[in-house]
């Protein structure tokens, strides 16, 4: 998946998915996928902006690897 990290601080990352507009089904799949990860504290998906905000506890590289 192609993406751009828009903003990050320790424990939170905001990512924009590089596509047109995200469907509700795609947003649900992404939210379920990242909520199932052990490092995930909370996940918000904004389908109109094609953005994901992930609050995590753990290694940043693991989150970025799962985004790819």
Each PLM stretch: what is its role?
Residues 58-68:
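Charge-rich, low-aromatic oligomerization/scaffolding segments with amphipathic character
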Residues 2, 12-15, 30-57:
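Short acidic amphipathic segments
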Residues 16-26:
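Short, surface-exposed ligand-recognition loops at beta-strand->loop->(often short) alpha-helix junctions
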């Amino acid at each position: 998946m192609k993406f751009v990290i828009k903003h990050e601080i320790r424990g939170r990352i905001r990512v924009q998915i590089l596509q047109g507009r995200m469907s509700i089904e795609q947003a649900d799949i992404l939210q379920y996928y990242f909520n199932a990860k052990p490092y995930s504290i909370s996940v918000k998906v904004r389908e109109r902006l094609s953005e994901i905000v992930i609050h995590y506890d753990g290694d940043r590289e693991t989150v970025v690897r799962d985004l790819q």
